[in-house]
Design a protein with these regions (language model features):
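Alpha-helix capping/helix-boundary segments
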Residues: 36-38, 57-58, 74-75, 145-146, ...
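Short loop/helix-cap segments at secondary-structure boundaries that form the rim of catalytic
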Residues: 58-65
Length: 215
């Protein structure tokens, strides 16, 4: 098995760049770290380009892509966790066009979560994971929201990001228009209301807006 021993290695340089949103957007790729997340990426049919493992890590089996060993100190520089599990993958983004996304969220007849300029990676990952568990059919993000393909969000989402289509728009107005085109009833969270969430019927075909802006 090939072992990467230099930070000038082409694969290693790509992985280093993918820690930045600029290059994730440019290359249409992102990193997924950890045993469970990488395995879920494979099981859900994600397009994995390469799997990297720390030199002291057992060699994983069953991946249809190259598996490359990385000198431990170099791997630790890529890892985004204090106690790395010693495995990460480079994955090609799934970026549906508008019509494909609409078909995906219509087909499931489920709810859609809309993230409006949220920033905290842990919170966003938890929201995506919870929405997936609740049967939501997709995620829409508005410009200004943290990158869903950042390492912390990918890890916090715990595989849910692989199961839910994602689509990004430039404005809240465009997002609402998209939800309405999909036949969703739009509901926004906020403080300026007397309506409590448990009094609202949200079992299906809802576009739920979670916003950083107090509505």
């Amino acid at each position: 098995m090939k072992t990467i021993t230099s930070k000038e290695n082409q694969i290693y340089r790509l992985c280093s760049k993918l820690t930045s949103r600029k290059y994730r957007d440019l290359y249409g790729k992102y990193l997924a770290e950890g045993e469970k997340v990488v395995r879920e990426a494979q099981e859900t049919g994600q397009n994995i380009q390469v799997v990297l493992v720390a030199q002291n890590h057992p060699i994983p089996q069953g991946y249809p892509c190259p598996v490359v060993s990385v000198e431990t100190k170099l791997f630790e520089k890529l890892a985004q966790t204090m106690t790395s599990q010693g495995i990460l993958a480079v994955i090609n983004k799934v970026q549906p066009d508008e019509q494909t996304f609409l078909q995906q969220i219509k087909k499931k007849s489920g709810n859609v979560i809309l993230l409006d300029r949220l920033q905290d990676p842990g919170n966003i990952g938890t929201i995506i994971r919870t929405a997936d568990a609740a049967g939501y059919s997709g995620v829409i993000t508005i410009k200004g929201t943290a990158d869903l393909y950042g390492p912390k969000i990918v890890r916090a989402a715990a595989g849910s990001l692989f199961r839910m289509p994602v689509f990004s728009v430039d404005s809240p107005e465009r997002a609402v228009s998209l939800l309405e085109a999909a036949g969703k009833t739009v509901i926004a969270t906020g403080f300026q209301t007397d309506l409590y969430y448990y009094n609202v019927k949200m079992d299906r075909d809802i576009g739920l807006i979670l916003s950083l802006i107090h509505i």
